[in-house]
Amino acid sequence: MFHLTTALDAASGVPLYEQLYESLAAEMRSGAIPAGTRMPGKRRLAAELSVSVNTVDAAYQILATEGYMEPRERSGFYVQEYLALPTRPEEVPPPVSAAPPEAAEPPVRFDLSTRGVDPRLFPFRTWARLQKELLYSSPQLLTHGDAQGDVELRQALADYLEEYRGVRCTAEQVVVGAGMEYLLSLLAPLLPGKTAVENPGYQRAKQVLENNGVACCCLPVDADGLSVEALSGSGAAVCYVTPSHQFPTGVTMPAGRRTELLHWASRCPGQRYIIEDDYDSEFRFDTPPLPSLQGMAGADGPVVYLSTCSRSLAPGIRIAYMVLPRQLLPAWRAKYRIYSGTVSRFEQQTLARFIREGYFTRHLARERVAYKARRDALTASLRAAFAPDELTLTGLHTGLHLLARLKNAPPDAALHAAAKAQGVALSLLSDYDLTGGEQEFPGTFVLGYGSLSEASFPEAGETLRKVCTAAREASVTV
């Protein structure tokens, strides 16, 4: 007699053949019906379970289709051999090392981090309207797009960059991707050799390049940006720079230094390149921006231009773009033509219209007004809290952060600990030392004001003073 451990329920909303299939499959998986077992004939099992032959037949067919049983001619159905499972499952080994429980972090009262932007400035209504129109009118955007990005967005970006950043390129030179890190990782295999990066500088860019097999060397930054003298003696074939707003020092590379840098690259055509990360170029408050390095070099020059919408729109949009020199296009296409695009086509087309119809430039103008007011409020708060010779402010003219150098500063570790205790999220210039060596940039705060609310600015300076006082007291007692 054949017995099921689970009874069939005719009153259930689940069809009987599905109940029978589930019960038999479970018993086969558990080993209750061993592998190799000859299953009862359909009529016999139907009689024993008081169900129709069609019910048993339907359950058997599903079990056979899914590999639980195999039919043998003139013999019946047999449970597949490979379905036999151990009756006692192996114990799961413990983790190699249990992570200690994290201590509760003090709540952040003042967010002075450099990556913050204000989501309230995002153009929600316009963006939503454009996306809705595209969603209903352009179903073709659900299909695959160009690996370099939709041509409409690439053309809109090329036109915008030419007008506002002096970049000289065609749409075919523009590559759209989901973030600067993604684009850098694709660019890395095309680079001819060692890459020089700024120090202090952007750790993320260095890490991405190294993750993709590019050797990096760290070169000093002076009052005019990356030292070309140090670059010339470094043996590097590529340099990664942020000339519009050096991160994190805030230095803007002047025209003379830009010319020197281009001369360095032009001495070895096709063997030297400059990666220009046009970081924060949209936010220049007091003076007109200098033209991009790419614009100075031209479409056939040795400059790869990088930018992103993470600051101008929002980090969650995940749209970055790169302008390749024409001589790198064949290598790019040979390597990446099989790739798929990484940015939603609806997002791409929304941004294309946002730029083409003039919304982007108006949005940037509103952002500049808002962020300039925040910069002014933060500097006023700092100057009210500190004596004139106690705190030196630099890097005020561009971007969404500034530097504050503290006179007779306590150790940076003490400043970090005191800031954390006061609920202040901030960075110090030494955090961006890429050499990992001894501290070279002591006592300098890197203060972002992109995400700080207007109501917080009056207290920001006094809170930072409390941080400095607590750090000094802690240093004395150690």
Go through each PLM region and give its residues.
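Conserved core of the PLP fold type I
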Residues: 131-134, 140-271, 282, 286-299, ...
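Residue-level marker for buried hydrophobic side chains located in beta-strands
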Residues: 112, 274-275
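Active-site PLP attachment segment
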Residues: 74, 296-331
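N-terminal basic, amphipathic alpha-helical segments
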Residues: 1-132, 139-142, 327-328, 333, ...
